Amino acid sequence: MASYTSTSGQFAVGKVAAANQDDETCMHALKLLGGLAVPFTIKAVIELGIMDLLLAADRAMTAEALTAALLCPAPAPAAAAAMVDRMLRFLASHGVVRCATESEELGSDDGKSCRRYAAAPVCKWFARGGGVESVVPMGFWMTSTTNMETWHNIKDGVLAGETPFDKAYGMPVFEYLGANGTMNTLFNEAMASHSMIITKRLLEVFRGFENYSVLVDVGGGNGTTMQMIRSQYENISGINYDLPHVIAQASPIEGVEHVAGNMFDNIPRGDAIILKWILHNWGDKECVKILKNCYTALPVNGTVIILEYILPETPEETLASQLAFDFDLGMMLFFGASGKERTEKELLELAREAGFSGDYTATYIFANVWAHEFTK
């Protein structure tokens, strides 16, 4: 007859008294290869409306209560609740939500338990709704089928010496977005949500906007960044500059002129120019061309403000380092060997080559993004 052992009255699963190195590295390997489970489970919880319920709740909720509160009730509530419970306990193991088990709290030893869930601090970034700071649009872009297909083409891209995205779709990413309205909207929403988060902190810590009369946002998307800056600095006349298919989706903004064009041809004149998440799309030669066009568009003592991640010289096992290298790999997916995040030294060299010989300052903004100011 089979026998079972338990620890402290609970059936122990996966506990190892003295894990050896092989045990640890094998579990690590399996966890790394199963990494897709986290973003896609978070996405499902957001789409179901469960994340919004957790954020709005004033107390922890069971999976049954959460399932019953869904806007689109499930036809098989018991099965749905069981699935939701498994999803949430998985997310709890990754620190995404908090979980408490009633039997443990009440000292019960009858083997029955009821889990209740609450939002963890990170959940605030998964909120939805107009005007809220959220990484949800970025997450939906990252988990889109377009992105997933691109990941499947990394190996072939390396072997063929091609950009993985181009290998998957037969055209560069911006050409694809220009021809695909749905994905273009998804991408623009992702960029706008990121701009909202970073620009809010930029306005809190960055000094100098009061000195500008005309500010140009190159690759400014729908104008979110410029709109937020003008809300505090009405002295500025803003120019939101981007490709025609992007500007076509931009709504009118008071004090901001939407201008369609190509930054490789020319850049509108201004006292200062912002480049947010632009240079990491391009190789060094293209970046110097963009910066030279910025130099031409600026007056003496004019400033270009570059908002980018900064790569550490040596990879580190820190959240900031991992995030920077995550995005560096993303640039490789969409732009091949050319697109990349850079070290501070590499950015400085590009600016100097483009002619910026004046003052240089770097200011930490938020979420591993830095503002690099180069003066003409």
From Swiss-Prot:
The active site is at H280. It comes from the Eukaryota. One of its GO terms (molecular function) is S-adenosylmethionine-dependent methyltransferase activity. One of its GO terms (biological process) is biosynthetic process. It catalyses: (E)-isoeugenol + S-adenosyl-L-methionine = (E)-isomethyleugenol + S-adenosyl-L-homocysteine + H(+). Keywords: Methyltransferase, S-adenosyl-L-methionine, Transferase. This is Eugenol O-methyltransferase. Belongs to the class I-like SAM-binding methyltransferase superfamily. Cation-independent O-methyltransferase family. COMT subfamily. Homodimer. O-methyltransferase. Substrate preference is eugenol >> orcinol monomethyl ether > resorcinol monomethyl ether. Expressed predominantly in root hairs. Its EC number is 2.1.1.146. Pfam families: Dimerisation, Methyltransf_2. S-adenosyl-L-methionine binds at G219, D242, M263, K276.
